[in-house]
Regions:
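Terminal amphipathic alpha-helical/low-complexity segments used for targeting or macromolecular assembly
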Residues: 1-50, 152
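Left-handed beta-helix
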Residues: 54, 59-60, 65-66, 74-75, ...
């Protein structure tokens, strides 16, 4: 019964807002983290197997060819215009107390992030960058750069 109610609520919320990004924009604009719309947002994101923090910031809606499948974007992360984000990507905060890299990623415009890539901590990814599949990024990346592999 509970799932049926959530499904009905989701249907009506999506009728009003048209897509998940409009729901997120509404929640942020109105400083809401509770209520029916927030519940539907959380339900949809988790149902798709991902997480997009409500306080994460997007210059426009990113293109996700495989949907939210395994995508994790932490709260307070920032993503520029025309981002392409593939499945199983982590854009995550570093909150370890003894870390030199505490903070949230800031990603520039026109950035392509390949499947399984991990961007962790207080790093800045420049504009027009390509982050390869399964790359691990823990340092800043200059504009127009290509990153592949894992730090040594």
């Amino acid at each position: 019964m509970k799932n049926m109610i959530k499904s009905m609520l989701s249907f009506f919320v999506f009728l009003k807002f048209k897509n998940i990004w409009n729901i997120k924009d509404y929640l942020v604009k109105n400083n809401l983290d509770k209520g029916i719309v927030a519940t539907v947002y959380d339900y949809y994101i988790h149902k798709e197997g991902g997480y997009v923090g409500i306080t994460s910031k997007f210059a426009n809606h990113p293109y996700m060819p495989h949907g939210f499948m395994g995508v994790f974007i932490s709260d307070m992360s920032e993503i520029g215009k025309n981002a392409v984000i593939f499945q199983q990507v982590t854009i995550g905060a570093d909150r370890l107390l003894d870390s030199n890299n505490q903070g949230n990623p800031k990603i520039g415009d026109n950035v392509y992030i390949g499947a399984g890539a991990k961007i962790i901590g207080n790093v800045k990814i420049g504009n027009n960058c390509r982050i390869g599949a399964n790359a691990v990024v823990v340092n800043d990346v200059a504009d127009n750069a290509v990153v592949a592999g894992k730090p040594g």
